[in-house]
Regions:
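N-terminal signal-anchor transmembrane alpha-helix
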Residues: 1-52
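Short, charged juxtamembrane terminal tails flanking transmembrane helices
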Residues: 1-7, 137-148
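Alpha-helical membrane-associated segments of multi-pass integral membrane proteins
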Residues: 96-143
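Central hydrophobic cores of alpha-helical transmembrane segments
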Residues: 66-81
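Hydrophobic core of alpha-helical transmembrane segments in multi-pass integral membrane proteins
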Residues: 19-28, 55-58, 119-131
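Interfacial non-cytosolic loop connecting adjacent transmembrane helices
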Residues: 33-45, 81-116
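Membrane-water interface at transmembrane helix exits
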Residues: 28-36, 77, 81, 85-89, ...
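Hydrophobic alpha-helical transmembrane segments
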Residues: 32-33, 56-65
Length: 148
């Protein structure tokens, strides 16, 4: 499934690294400037942000397409998860009962953005792997039959 592509020039390697790390740099800067008091962004920065940058940077040497899809998918899923989690939390606060405030650590008054992010990101990765294993070989075979 995973084959190392042909030798790349240093310019191609740098370009792949920049393409992989660009969405993280933009998200990090946006969090520092405008979104600094939000739940999911703070959680991501304090937990594994740098490790993910490093891991995807290394993966970009072996599988550049996967690394690009993973990085842009990650950023999109974080943004969607944060926004949907905040909307769900605000909506649940409007309809909360006193009993809901007692169990606020794991109930309808907790921020669901982390789980939304995780499910969306898992879906993005599964869809890419399915595309890479099933659809992409068919497209290549069809192009070869046509002589392109």
């Amino acid at each position: 499934m995973y084959q190392i592509e042909q030798e790349k020039t240093p310019q191609e390697i740098i370009l792949h690294l920049l393409l992989v790390l660009f969405p993280f740099m933009v998200l990090h800067r946006a969090v520092l400037l405008w979104l600094n008091n939000t739940y999911l962004y703070d959680w991501m920065e304090h937990r594994h942000y740098l490790a993910l940058w490093f891991t995807l940077g290394i993966v970009s040497f072996v599988q550049p397409k996967f690394a690009i899809v993973a990085s842009y998918g990650y950023v999109a899923c974080v943004v969607i998860g944060e926004r949907l989690g905040t909307l769900i939390l605000e909506n649940n606060k409007l309809t909360a009962t006193p009993e809901d405030y007692i169990m606020s650590c794991h109930g309808k008054l907790s921020h669901q953005g982390l789980w939304i992010w995780f499910q969306l990101y898992f879906t993005v990765i599964v869809l890419y792997v399915a595309y890479a294993r099933q659809i992409e070989p068919r497209i290549k075979a069809r192009r070869e039959r046509r002589g392109k």
